Amino acid sequence: MAANVSGAKSCPANFLAAADDKLSGFQGDFLWPILVVEFLVAVASNGLALYRFSIRKQRPWHPAVVFSVQLAVSDLLCALTLPPLAAYLYPPKHWRYGEAACRLERFLFTCNLLGSVIFITCISLNRYLGIVHPFFARSHLRPKHAWAVSAAGWVLAALLAMPTLSFSHLKRPQQGAGNCSVARPEACIKCLGTADHGLAAYRAYSLVLAGLGCGLPLLLTLAAYGALGRAVLRSPGMTVAEKLRVAALVASGVALYASSYVPYHIMRVLNVDARRRWSTRCPSFADIAQATAALELGPYVGYQVMRGLMPLAFCVHPLLYMAAVPSLGCCCRHCPGYRDSWNPEDAKSTGQALPLNATAAPKPSEPQSRELSQ
């Protein structure tokens, strides 16, 4: 916290230091070790997923693999931003890498977080097309289309994350503050997401990210999986066990999304609102005790909890979206549209049972189905 957003009076430096010291305690106590563990697991799981994709003999990759690779790359890059953040949060909270690295770390995390959401949405929509509209998918969707959509997704993520380069900055200690230590946190350099005088604009930006980077993709994912679920439930050729397996796979993906990205963005906006209210009142506080007592710890602690829990999604994505296990593809071959268009040769050529096998392009010399060849 740096200055009063009202512009009438500045917040006393000792009030700001006391507030920062109290709030930083939550990060130093639990957040940094969680980030270290998540980094190790996310790098191992997504690195393994990328390795498995790289040794696939079948080329070109069909859209399922293209989107899954983009998701693994975005998760891996996002995980690589966690070690410098953990080192920063480790007491004493001190940024040692310069202002350019501060801005870059914030940008890369936000960009790859948005990329992760975008490619999850692409996977969901591709599953929908492959199962509910298999004729269209097999006739029109090609790997080049998936690569083009992926490129557009990366550009969109970068554009949405670009403002973080402007908002992020270093807060340097006052001259003569001494050496940074646990006993002298006011002498440490802070890497901040935004200064208090920019909180109004930062709140608007956070709302845009919550809407375009979380809400809209969630609605598209829910719509795609809802239509897919209806197709599965109406399929007379599927057993109850197969339907339950599809339902579990879909529900787990939606639950992971709703329990990680959604609360993260909500708590981020609530935390910014709490910061604005405190900064506006700061010049009127009588003493340090009143200033620290006025801190709204609920939104802040909730946001820190989600900063620790949200990266767990990067660790779980390889299991949900990239693992070569029987999933929607093998179950939904009994779906009416899928059954008419599915070709056993597609399963052999893909070498995996990802739910999007139906989107693999048929060979020009082969009929799309027995019905079409008659």
From Swiss-Prot:
InterPro entries in alphabetical order: GPCR_Rhodpsn (IPR000276), GPCR_Rhodpsn_7TM (IPR017452), P2Y11_rcpt (IPR027677)
Membrane side Extracellular: residue ranges: 1-29, 86-116, 168-206, 267-308
Tissue distribution of the protein: Highest expression in liver and spleen.
Database matches in PROSITE patterns: G_PROTEIN_RECEP_F1_1 (PS00237), G_PROTEIN_RECEP_F1_2 (PS50262)
Topological type in the membrane: Multi-pass membrane protein
Entry keyword set: Cell membrane, Disulfide bond, G-protein coupled receptor, Glycoprotein, Membrane, Receptor, Transducer, Transmembrane, Transmembrane helix
Glycosylation positions in this chain: N4, N179
Induction notes from the record: Increased by DMSO and retinoic acid.
Keyword match Oxidoreductase: no
Compartmental location: Cell membrane
This protein's record includes keyword Membrane: yes
GO molecular function ontology, one term from the record: neurotransmitter receptor activity
TM ranges: 30-50, 65-85, 117-137, 147-167, 207-227, 246-266, 309-329
Cytoplasmic-side segments: 51-64, 138-146, 228-245, 330-374
Disulfide bonding pattern of the chain: C102-C180
GO process annotations (BP): activation of adenylate cyclase activity; calcium-mediated signaling; cellular response to ATP; defense response; G protein-coupled receptor signaling pathway; neuronal signal transduction; phospholipase C-activating G protein-coupled receptor signaling pathway
Domain of life: Eukaryota
Region described as Disordered: spans on this chain: 345-374
Annotated Gene Ontology cellular component terms: plasma membrane
Family according to the record: Belongs to the G-protein coupled receptor 1 family.
Function, in words: Receptor for ATP and ADP coupled to G-proteins that activate both phosphatidylinositol-calcium and adenylyl cyclase second messenger systems. Not activated by UTP or UDP.
Further information: A chimeric transcript, characterized by the first third of PPAN exon 12 joined to P2RY11 exon 2, has been detected. It is possibly produced by trans-splicing. The chimeric transcript is widely expressed and can be induced by retinoic acid during the granulocytic differentiation of the HL-60 cell line. The resulting chimeric protein shows a much lower activity than the non-chimeric P2RY11 gene product, but qualitatively indistinguishable.
UniProt protein name: P2Y purinoceptor 11
Organism of provenance: Homo sapiens
Taxonomic lineage from the root: Eukaryota, Metazoa, Chordata, Craniata, Vertebrata
Protein's gene: P2RY11
